[in-house]
Amino acid sequence: MSNTIFDDVFRTMIEKMPYLAVPLINEVFHTSYPQDVPIVQLRNEHQQENGEIITDSCLKIAGKLYHIECQSVDDTTMAIRMIEYDFYIAIENAQKQGRRYRIDFPKSCVLYLRSGNNTPDFLEIEMVLPDENIVHYQVPTIKLETYTRDSIFEKNLLMLLPFYIMRYEKDIHEMNENPEMFQNLLNEYDEVRTNLEKGLSGTDKAVLYMNLNKLIIKIADYICQNEEKVRKGIGEIMGGKVLELESERLERLRKEAEAEAKEKGEKIGKEIGEKIGKEIGKEI
């Protein structure tokens, strides 16, 4: 299965900014991990006879395995895919206890960027073991459309922001033609930018702010590729103001100090020159 832009953006966040997954894990599994909890990123390539399968993410937090898949469509085979992924993850992390093996399935969930009335809250499989015991395999789903701008920031689910435009996907063309709808969308994104600035105003978070901005614009450009007005409007709001990095701030202050010192030096030099000139004039 080929990657989509949504896969690429999601995996970029998981690989480069894995701490963004922590609030999402807390939301789904009702945990309370702090944002700075140590995270171990496990490999997401698993070999099988007819090639390799690639999962979107596999993280280890506090000794537990977490697996998150990002879906841009409501795939009815997703339950089978998930148990296949989870089985490979469990096997690769199997624990040998004498002649017995223990495999722990990861806590998994699926993030649906697009969903409908038939998208389930849980993916389910009923497994019948050789001894006739029945095991119920259940994976919770997260639906982007159920999260508003306010709830995203309240729960710190910043990982959802790049995909936020997809909540309005069906209305993009109309927004391009309707000034009022278009302005409402711009106001919405102005609030997103403002909230991001407030939450990531520290110099240590400036890089995260800029990276999220880039990903927000990347997905918006893709979704709005045929609607130039909307695409440009979001780009100007999100890309129009970039927080200053600490290194940039120090460089700016250095240049300002040098310019000020030069100006003062020139002024003092001029005053001294004038004074010397007057003294010479008196002697003559």
PLM feature spans:
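Arginine residue identity/basic-tract feature
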Residues: 11, 43, 81, 99-102, ...
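Short amphipathic alpha-helical signal-transduction/dimerization elements
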Residues: 86, 90-93, 169, 220-224, ...
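Accessory alpha/beta interaction modules
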Residues: 1-159
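Coupling/switch segment of ABC-type P-loop NTPase heads
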Residues: 153-180
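Short, charged alpha-helical interaction segments and adjacent helix-coil junctions
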Residues: 60-72, 173-284
